[in-house]
Amino acid sequence: MTSNLEAQLLALRQEGEQAIAAADTLERLEELRVSYLGKKGQLGALLRSMGQMSAEERPKIGAIANTVKEALQASLDKQRESLESAQIQAQLDAETLDVTMPGIYKPQGRIHPLNGIIDRALDVFVGLGYTVAQGLEMETDYYNFEALNTPPDHPARDMQDTFYLPDGNLLRTHTSSVQIRYMEKEEPPIHIVAPGRVYRRDNVDATHSAVFHQIELLAIDEGLTFTDLKGTIKVFLQAMFGDLPIRFRASYFPFTEPSAEVDLQWNGRWLEVMGCGMVDPNVMKSVGYDPEIYTGFAAGFGVERFAMVLHQIDDIRRLYASDLRFLRQF
């Protein structure tokens, strides 16, 4: 019996070493470990038959069994190290950057000049404590005109100046309508800035477009004066254009009283850049505010005009042409 069991152990060693050497994955190697050296493995099954042997035979077979176990374990360790090294090398080869290969061109994104002006302006006003407000581009006559103290016979209501829709609505001609809707929902104090796209029935040329962008600001509180308005505009224009001379000229807007145009001295000449004024009491009443308690100011400007001045653009149509040769300059 001893010689038979000894032969089985030696055959198991030879078979196991060959199988381990042929294992090509760590998963397969683990299967072989369990098969040969696990609790229910082949080596354990052979050793359980030692109970039938005499006391003199057991030490010899036990020594052979330990030798077989150590040999198989050594083969497992060696093959595991080899497979792990190969796995790491394969991963390194896959992730290695070949600096001799040509690069892949990735076009660099640019900020459109209109978006750049809007972002800069909003940053200034948000820094002053204003909240950004958005509104509808398709409006009713009430919010676009009537609530803003624009009477039915005002030239702005003319079919030649406004895009009227078949259902009686219109495309907003300014972002002032955002202010009315906001005031209807909120109580003073209010400090908002409203950017957005607006529409006018203008003939498209180098300085006019039927679609353009405005940014308007509104402040409502107790005790606000024209001095507060002037100070706010000066801070804003200095942030956008630098410390340049500005002036206020008397003007007229139906929704502000008094009203003014703001000029900026740019390259030796005065440029009209903004309109502004104190909110008309009739506008206050239309949203349920008491003009005896609250005062307010409003101002607005065209984003395209700012972009054309700051970037020295001679034709507003360039801003909408999607010409990459032009846009890559910004």
UniProtKB/Swiss-Prot annotation:
Subunit structure comment from the entry: Tetramer of two alpha and two beta subunits.
Key word Metal-binding present: yes
Main location: cytoplasm
Binding site for Mg(2+): 257
Organism: Trichormus variabilis (strain ATCC 29413 / PCC 7937)
Family: Belongs to the class-II aminoacyl-tRNA synthetase family. Phe-tRNA synthetase alpha subunit type 1 subfamily.
Protein's GO biological process: phenylalanyl-tRNA aminoacylation
InterPro entries attached to this UniProt entry: aa-tRNA-synth_II, aa-tRNA-synth_II/BPL/LPL, Phe-tRNA-synth_IIc_asu, Phe-tRNA_ligase_II_N, Phe_tRNA_ligase_alpha1_bac, Phenylalanyl-tRNA_Synthase, tRNA-bd_arm
GO molecular-function terms, A-Z: ATP binding; magnesium ion binding; phenylalanine-tRNA ligase activity; tRNA binding
EC number: 6.1.1.20
Subcellular location, record wording: Cytoplasm
Keyword annotations of the record: Aminoacyl-tRNA synthetase, ATP-binding, Cytoplasm, Ligase, Magnesium, Metal-binding, Nucleotide-binding, Protein biosynthesis
Pfam family, one: Phe_tRNA-synt_N
Protein name: Phenylalanine--tRNA ligase alpha subunit
Catalytic activity: tRNA(Phe) + L-phenylalanine + ATP = L-phenylalanyl-tRNA(Phe) + AMP + diphosphate + H(+)
Enzyme type, top EC level: ligase
Gene Ontology, cellular component aspect: cytoplasm
Cofactor note: Binds 2 magnesium ions per tetramer.
NCBIfam families noted in UniProt: pheS
Cofactor(s) needed by this chain: Mg(2+)
